[in-house]
C-alpha cells in the first residue's frame, strides 16, 4: 500500500516544523504530489502536515497514468514506456505494482520523485482549501477519493 500526498496550501504563515516536514516530503510547491510507502515514519509526517495537504491510498491504474503523464527524468525529459523499460528494466505496470507493494521507492529509480500537477479541473468540488475533507473541504485524508482528484489534476 502506498499513499499519494498532494500539497494544497501554500507556504505563507506555516510554522517552521511543518515547513521542515514538507521539505522532507519533497512538497515544496502547491499541486506537487509524492507517492510514499505506508509506514510509521511517513504516517507521522503526514499527520503533522495534514492541514496543508490531502492524501489517500493510490491505486495501480492511477499510479501508471501518473508516471506516464506527469513523470519526468533529470533535465525535465518526458517518460515513455520504451524509455522506462530501458532505464528501470521493468514495464510500467510491474513498476507500479512494486511501488505499491513497497519493494521499490520512486526515488531509487531515475524518475523524479515529485510529480508536478495542474490545479484540479472544476476545482476541489466542495468547501475550499481551508477545511478538512470530512467536513466538506479539500484537506486531510480522503482514502480512495485521492484517485479521482489525481485524475482531475493530470
UniProtKB/Swiss-Prot annotation:
Sorted UniProt keywords: Ribonucleoprotein, Ribosomal protein
Entry keyword Repeat: no
One Gene Ontology cellular component annotation held by this UniProt entry: cytosolic large ribosomal subunit
N-terminal signal peptide: none
Pfam families hit by this protein: Ribosomal_L30
GO terms (BP aspect): maturation of LSU-rRNA from tricistronic rRNA transcript (SSU-rRNA, 5.8S rRNA, LSU-rRNA); translation
CDD domains cross-referenced by the UniProt entry: Ribosomal_L7_archeal_euk
Molecular function terms from GO: RNA binding; structural constituent of ribosome
InterPro entries, per the entry: Ribo_uL30_ferredoxin-like_sf, Ribosomal_uL30, Ribosomal_uL30_arc, Ribosomal_uL30_CS, Ribosomal_uL30_euk_arc, Ribosomal_uL30_ferredoxin-like
Subunit comment: Part of the 50S ribosomal subunit.
Similarity remark: Belongs to the universal ribosomal protein uL30 family.
HAMAP family to which the protein is assigned, alphabetical: Ribosomal_uL30_A
Protein name: Large ribosomal subunit protein uL30
Source species of the chain: Methanococcus vannielii (strain ATCC 35089 / DSM 1224 / JCM 13029 / OCM 148 / SB)
Amino acid at each position: 500500500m502506498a499513499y499519494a500526498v498532494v500539497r494544497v496550501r501554500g507556504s505563507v504563515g506555516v510554522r517552521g516544523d511543518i515547513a521542515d516536514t514538507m521539505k522532507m516530503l519533497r512538497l515544496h510547491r502547491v499541486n506537487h504530489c509524492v507517492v510514499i510507502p505506508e509506514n510509521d515514519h511517513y504516517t507521522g509526517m503526514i499527520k503533522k502536515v495534514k492541514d496543508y495537504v490531502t492524501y489517500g491510498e493510490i491505486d495501480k491504474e492511477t499510479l501508471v497514468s501518473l508516471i506516464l503523464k506527469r513523470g519526468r527524468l533529470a533535465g525535465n525529459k518526458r517518460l515513455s514506456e520504451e524509455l522506462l523499460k530501458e532505464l528501470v528494466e521493468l514495464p510500467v505496470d510491474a513498476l507500479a505494482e512494486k511501488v505499491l507493494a513497497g519493494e521499490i521507492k520512486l526515488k531509487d529509480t531515475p524518475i523524479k520523485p515529485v510529480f508536478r500537477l495542474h490545479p484540479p479541473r472544476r476545482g476541489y468540488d466542495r468547501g475550499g482549501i481551508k477545511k478538512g475533507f470530512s467536513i466538506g473541504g479539500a484537506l486531510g485524508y480522503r482514502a480512495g477519493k485521492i484517485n479521482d482528484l489525481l485524475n482531475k489534476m493530470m
